[in-house]
Curated annotation (Swiss-Prot):
Record carries keyword RNA-binding: no
Species of the source: Bacillus cereus (strain G9842)
Descriptive protein name: Putative 3-methyladenine DNA glycosylase
Keywords carried by this UniProt record: DNA damage, DNA repair, Hydrolase
Keyword DNA damage: yes
Length: 205
């Protein structure tokens, strides 16, 4: 079942933790690619110096952050790596959750091809398929075309995992500082990165 619009409403930190263990799905050329979310980061601009929307900064790139929760915010870093975020909080409150890592589930062969241009890969390469925000976007085929897309769409959405299949029974949620935000002054220390401790696909232990 797809996560309903109400799933994305409420406090961004709570939504971030709720996203752990759910499945991110992208349909590419009719083929389902997906992964279980195992690592996220919350961004609570305009008061969060690590957020693109800090200070209420409103640009063409960040405009989607000011819209309704439950939409995709995709951007490029270093001019080459895409990052996928889920918009949270009410309209006009630019907050979101960066999906940092997934455990691949569906479309494994397509994911391998997207990452390595081959399907015969090593165990180390397999663990590297979706263990980072840029990696998972490449694996699932998420690009700037998906920016602003509703997560109620048929092609891009979050699938709720039934409780009896949820990996939360195997891993504990850990919290810590977010990654690669050295510019963010005191926000560097906010423990707004949430992940499954010990999960092999987490980007940074």
């Amino acid at each position: 079942m797809q996560a309903p619009p109400s799933f994305y409403e409420g406090d961004t930190l709570e939504v971030a933790k709720k996203l752990l263990g759910q499945k991110l799905v992208h349909i590419v050329d009719g083929i389902k690619r997906s992964g279980i979310i195992v690592e996220v980061e919350a961004y609570k601009g305009p008061d969060d110096k690590a957020a693109h929307s800090y200070g209420g900064r409103r640009t063409d790139r960040t405009e989607v952050m000011f819209g309704a929760p439950g939409h995709a915010y995709v951007y490029l870093i270093y001019g080459m790596y895409h990052c996928f975020n889920v918009i949270t909080a009410p309209v006009g409150t630019p907050q979101g959750v960066l999906i940092r890592a997934l455990e691949p589930v569906d479309g494994i062969e397509e994911i391998k091809l997207a990452r390595y241009n081959k399907t015969d890969i090593t165990k180390a390469q397999y663990k590297n398929l979706t263990s980072g925000p840029g990696k998972l976007c490449r694996a699932l085929g998420i690009t700037l075309k998906e920016r602003g897309l509703s997560l109620q769409s048929d092609t891009l959405h979050i699938e709720l995992v039934p409780k009896d299949e949820h990996i939360s029974s195997q891993y504990k949620i850990a919290a810590g500082p977010r990654i690669n935000i050295d510019y963010a002054e005191e926000a560097v220390h906010y423990p707004w990165r949430f992940y499954y401790k010990g999960h092999p696909f987490v980007s940074k232990k």
